[in-house]
Swiss-Prot record:
The keyword rRNA-binding is annotated on this UniProt entry: yes
GO cellular component, one term: small ribosomal subunit
SUPFAM superfamilies named in the record: dsRNA-binding domain-like (SSF54768), Ribosomal protein S5 domain 2-like (SSF54211)
Organism field: Desulfitobacterium hafniense (strain DSM 10664 / DCB-2)
The organism's taxonomic lineage, starting at the top: Bacteria, Bacillati, Bacillota, Clostridia, Eubacteriales
Record-linked PANTHER family: MITOCHONDRIAL RIBOSOMAL PROTEIN S5 (PTHR48277:SF1)
UniProt xrefs under InterPro entries: Ribosomal_Su5_D2-typ_SF, Ribosomal_uS5, Ribosomal_uS5_bac-type, Ribosomal_uS5_C, Ribosomal_uS5_N, Ribosomal_uS5_N_CS, Ribsml_uS5_D2-typ_fold_subgr
Protein name: Small ribosomal subunit protein uS5
Record's subunit section: Part of the 30S ribosomal subunit. Contacts proteins S4 and S8.
Keywords on record: Ribonucleoprotein, Ribosomal protein, RNA-binding, rRNA-binding
C-alpha cells in the first residue's frame, strides 16, 4: 500500500473523543488530555490519530498530526464500499455493509466520524463488543484497510472479474 502524502490533500478533521486523564504521583494527580481525531479528504483517504497534551487544543493538534501520518486509501464504489467486511481491534468489532444510494450513513458516533471523513455516504454498520471510541475507530480503520476491489482480487488470482463475481 502506497504512503499517502497528507500535505497534498484538502483534509477535514473530526474530534471523536476527548478525555481528561490523570497520572498519579506522590504529590497527587497530574492531569492531561488525550484527543482521538480522524482526518480525511472525503474521496477515500482517511486516517486516525491520538494526541496527548496538557491542554485540549494542543492534544487535538497532536492528534491531527498523528492521523495524517496514519492515512489509508479506501476503495470506494460510487458512494459505498465494495463488499461487506468485519474489522476487529481489541474487544471491539465493526461490521460494514455496502448500501444502496440514498441510504445514508447508518452508524454510531465513532464509526460514523471515520466513514464521513473518508467520503463514504451510503453504508450500513453494526458495532459489536466494546463500545470504547478508541476500539471502534481502530476496528473501523482495520476494516477499511482490508477492503479490496474485485479487479485487484481477480488480478491476484489470475482470473477475470466475471469469474470472481460468479
Amino acid at each position: 500500500m502506497a504512503k499517502i502524502d497528507a500535505s497534498k490533500l484538502e483534509l477535514t478533521e473530526k474530534v471523536v473523543h476527548i478525555a481528561r486523564v490523570a497520572k498519579v504521583v506522590k504529590g497527587g494527580r497530574r492531569f492531561s488530555f488525550s484527543a482521538l481525531v480522524v482526518v480525511g479528504d472525503g474521496h477515500g483517504n482517511v486516517g486516525a490519530g491520538l494526541g496527548k497534551a496538557g491542554e485540549v487544543p494542543e492534544a487535538i493538534r497532536k492528534g491531527m498530526e498523528d492521523a495524517k501520518k496514519n492515512m489509508v486509501s479506501v476503495p470506494l464504489i460510487g458512494t459505498t464500499i465494495p463488499h461487506a467486511i468485519l474489522g476487529n481491534y481489541g474487544a471491539g468489532s465493526v461490521l460494514l455493509k455496502p448500501a444502496a444510494k440514498g441510504t445514508g450513513v447508518i452508524a454510531g458516533g465513532a464509526v460514523r466520524a471515520v466513514l464521513e471523513v473518508a467520503g463514504v455516504s451510503d453504508i450500513l454498520t453494526k458495532s459489536l463488543g466494546s463500545a470504547n471510541p478508541h476500539n471502534m475507530v481502530n476496528a473501523t480503520m482495520a476494516a477499511l484497510k482490508s477492503l479490496k476491489r474485485a479487479e485487484d482480487v481477480a488480478r491476484l488470482r489470475g482470473k477475470t472479474v466475471e469469474e470472481i463475481l460468479g
